[in-house]
From Swiss-Prot:
Residues 1-7 are cytoplasmic. This is Cytochrome c-type biogenesis protein CcmE. Belongs to the CcmE/CycJ family. It comes from Methylobacterium nodulans (strain LMG 21967 / CNCM I-2342 / ORS 2060). Pfam families: CcmE (PF03100).
Length: 168
């Protein structure tokens, strides 16, 4: 073999090894990739029962029902469609009706979503990106409040005074 043929053979073997390695990594990750869906997407698309995904939206007002042994049932909505959810376990402290939630689990044949994990928003301004995108897509996004003139009000102390700026 000439030097050029050996070099091409080495490049080909390296390319094949990289392709096999990439294939093995993707095959190993196939069970850990979980897609996000909103209630409207579930209603409009046929989601096969038993497929894991994340369901995101708002906890519908008046829908939370707590049962024995830590069982909880509630409804997730995006103001376009609703999906009933069943969960057994401890809910996050910030889980409330009307708040953003992301539940990970699978849809059962009857249309009930069985959640393994429930995540609640952690402060007043945070909403999971997927939930915000789904609400924007449905036209229900209210966004951040705009201040007159397009600027935020000046910060104030508890007594109403404006704090002095520190020089560095």
């Amino acid at each position: 073999m000439t030097r050029k043929q050996r070099r091409l053979m080495l490049i080909g073997v390296c390319g094949a090894v990289l392709a096999v390695a990439l294939g093995l990594v993707l095959w190993a990750m196939r069970g850990t990739i979980v897609f996000f869906r909103s209630p409207s997407e579930i209603a409009s698309q046929a989601v096969a029962p038993g497929v894991r995904f994340r369901l995101g939206g708002l906890v519908q007002e008046g829908s939370v029902q707590r049962g024995p042994d830590g069982r909880v049932a509630f409804v997730v909505t995006d103001n376009g469609a609703t999906v009933p959810v069943r969960y057994q376990g401890l809910l996050p402290d910030l889980f409330r009706e009307g708040q953003g939630v992301v539940a990970e689990g699978m849809l059962e044949p009857g249309g009930m979503f069985r959640a393994d994990t429930v995540l609640a928003k952690h402060d007043e301004t945070y909403m999971p990106r997927e939930v915000a995108d789904a609400l924007k897509k449905q036209g229900h996004w209210q966004g951040e409040a705009k201040h007159p003139g397009g600027t935020a009000p000046a910060p104030q102390t508890a007594s109403g005074e404006k704090p002095a700026l520190r020089q560095q």
